[in-house]
Structure formats: structure tokens, C-alpha cells
């Protein structure tokens, strides 16, 4: 049997990069998918790719930083499938790579809202719909445990995700819901290219090659594992 046969997975930020790769990987393993991004135009091709693999999928555009939009997203997902087994909080923005003294306040708020508040809103709305044995996977980063120059709001937002991951793990453990964080490491994505414009993109792992830990955490193999932090590329090499 496929690892995720019959499981319902909601993936935010699924129109490109890692989110798209996870949607396709989960589809191959038998999951039913709810794919989300802000842009319906960019989301539609991913849904078509998932359908081509024979998986059931619904594409639901929504802004994770807007509570009304998030409530509609989650309620539509739950109405369609009856509950959620896997939640991947993947949506996020990089923001400007400038020093704090130069960081525009509106950009600061935009990044914090997308990366931290958005994860809070999606998680909060999803909790009542999480099935027993569900798995929540939160995306973190190397700069969520070590502040570095010119990473500003992105780094701060991911520090917040680290804390929220621990809080959710503790609060949901008695509901048989596990919550874990994953640092995907550097990948060949648009966000990575924006952060490191001079880097050779081909030197980085493709998102499609970086899904092993996400499959593990979504599957029943990880039951009982909660409050942990994984490095995807180290897990991939095991």
C-alpha cells in the first residue's frame, strides 16, 4: 500500500518550489490533496499535475495572512474531504535583504504576516478539523536558529515559527496530533535565487529530491514523533 493512501493533505504555498514538489510526492503516495496559494493562475497547473497522477485534488486560492480567507480555505477543505490528516505550513515570503536600519516597516509587517501570522491562522483554523493521528509540518530555516545580517523579518518570523511549533506540539499531543518542524536547507528555488543571486542554482538540491522527511512525517511511520526539528537534507542522506 502507498504510504499516504487515503490521507487528506493541505499544503500552503503549493504553487511552486517545495510546495509543488510535496503535492506531487504526496499524490504519488495515495494522498488526497488540498493545494493552496495566493494566485489561482499559478495554482491551477499544479492541480492539473496532481490530477494527472490519478490523485483527487482541490485547488483553493487564499491569502494565509487574512483570517477570513483562511477560514474559507479550511472550511472548504474540511467540507470536501471531511477532515485533515496532514497540514504542511509551507507558505512564506523572503522580503528585502537589507539591514534593520534600512528595513521598510510595511515590508516588515508583510513578511511577518505571511510567515508567522499566516502559520498561526492556518493552524488555528485547522485544529478543529484535524483527524486523530494527524501530522502538522512547519517549515523553518537555518536563520530561524541563528540570526544573520540582512535576513531581517524573514529570520525573525522563522524564529517565531520555531516557538509556535513547540507550543502546538505540546498543546495538541493529547489529541493524538503530532507537530514537527523541518528545515529544508538550500534548494534550487525562486526564493533561494532571490536570496543568493550570485549562487550557482544547479549546485543546490532540487525540491523534488528533498521530500523524504516530509513523506516520513506525513505517514504513520512517524506516529509518536512530535515537537522535533528535522533537517531535510540530512534525513535524505540516511
Residue ranges and their predicted role:
Residues 128, 169-174:
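Alpha-helical segment proximal to the catalytic Tyr-Lys
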Residues 174, 181-182, 189, 198-238:
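C-terminal helical subdomain
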Residues 98-100, 104-109:
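Substrate-binding pocket helix/loop in short-chain dehydrogenase/reductase
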Residues 123, 157:
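Active-site helix of classical SDR
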Residues 8, 15-16:
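Conserved glycine-rich cofactor-binding loop
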Residues 40-41, 61-73, 105:
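The beta1-alpha1 cofactor-binding region of Rossmann-like NAD(H)/NADP(H)-dependent oxidoreductases
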Residues 29-46:
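Conserved glycine-rich Rossmann-like NAD(P)H-binding loop of the short-chain dehydrogenase/reductase
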Amino acid at each position: 500500500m502507498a504510504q499516504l493512501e487515503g490521507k487528506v493533505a493541505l499544503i500552503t504555498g503549493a504553487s511552486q518550489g517545495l510546495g509543488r514538489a510535496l503535492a506531487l510526492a504526496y499524490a504519488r503516495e495515495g494522498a488526497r490533496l488540498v493545494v493552496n496559494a495566493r494566485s489561482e493562475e499559478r495554482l491551477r497547473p499544479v492541480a492539473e499535475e496532481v490530477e494527472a497522477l490519478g490523485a483527487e485534488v482541490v485547488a483553493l486560492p487564499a491569502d494565509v495572512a487574512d483570517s477570513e480567507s483562511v477560514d474559507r480555505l479550511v472550511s472548504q477543505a474540511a467540507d470536501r474531504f471531511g477532515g485533515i490528516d496532514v497540514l504542511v505550513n509551507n507558505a512564506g515570503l523572503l522580503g528585502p535583504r537589507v539591514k534593520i536600519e534600512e528595513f521598510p516597516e510595511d515590508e516588515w509587517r508583510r513578511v511577518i504576516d505571511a510567515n508567522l501570522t499566516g502559520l498561526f491562522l492556518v493552524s488555528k483554523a485547522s485544529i478543529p478539523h484535524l483527524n486523530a493521528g494527524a501530522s502538522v509540518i512547519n517549515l523553518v530555516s537555518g536563520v530561524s536558529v541563528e540570526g544573520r545580517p540582512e535576513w531581517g523579518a524573514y529570520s525573525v518570523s522563522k524564529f517565531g515559527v520555531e516557538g509556535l511549533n513547540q507550543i502546538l506540539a505540546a498543546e495538541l499531543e493529547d489529541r493524538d496530533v503530532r507537530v514537527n518542524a523541518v528545515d529544508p536547507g538550500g534548494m534550487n528555488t525562486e526564493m533561494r535565487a532571490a536570496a543568493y543571486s550570485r549562487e550557482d542554482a544547479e549546485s543546490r538540491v532540487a525540491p523534488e529530491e528533498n521530500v523524504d522527511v516530509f513523506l516520513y512525517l506525513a505517514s504513520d511511520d512517524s506516529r509518536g514523533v512530535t515537537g522535533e526539528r528535522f533537517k531535510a537534507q540530512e534525513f535524505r542522506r540516511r
